[in-house]
């Protein structure tokens, strides 16, 4: 009987752990690229600060740069 109770608790914990893993996955990979509005803001901020390089780093996106030439023109 003890083995059965321990086994059931183990299965319940395993199911809870698997459910917790599934809920965390979409949060980590929520958004990879900024929207057009976020790029427009990044480009406007860059131009306001005197940067005329035609690319701007989008806020909150580590490795993504917006092509300001396409957005502004």
Curated annotation (Swiss-Prot):
One CC-aspect GO term: extracellular region
List the expressing tissues. Expressed by the venom gland.
Q: What subcellular locations does the record give? A: Secreted
Q: Which Cys-Cys disulfides exist here?
A: 39-66, 43-68
Q: Where does the UniProt entry say this protein principally localizes?
A: secreted
| Membrane-spanning intervals of the chain | none
Key words of the record: Disulfide bond, Secreted, Signal, Toxin
One example of the protein's molecular function in GO is: toxin activity
Coiled-coil region:
none
What does this chain do?
Activity unknown, even that a lot of targets (Kv, Nav, Cav) have been tested and activities on insects and mice have been tested.
Question: What does the domain comment read?
Answer: Has the structural arrangement of an alpha-helix connected to a beta-sheet by disulfide bonds (CS-alpha/beta). Since the toxin contains only 2 disulfide bonds, it is called 2ds-CSalpha/beta.
Spell out the family assignment given in the record's similarity comment: Belongs to the scoloptoxin-15 family.
User: In its UniProt entry, what is this protein called?
Assistant: U-scoloptoxin(15)-Sm2a
User: What phylogenetic lineage does the species belong to?
Assistant: Eukaryota, Metazoa, Ecdysozoa, Arthropoda, Myriapoda
């Amino acid at each position: 009987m003890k083995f059965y109770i321990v086994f059931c608790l183990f299965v319940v914990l395993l199911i809870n752990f698997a459910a917790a893993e599934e809920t965390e996955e979409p949060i980590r990979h929520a958004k990879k690229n900024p929207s057009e509005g976020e790029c427009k803001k990044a480009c406007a901020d860059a131009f306001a600060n005197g940067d005329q390089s035609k690319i701007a780093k989008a806020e909150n996106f580590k490795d993504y740069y917006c092509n300001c030439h396409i957005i502004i023109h």
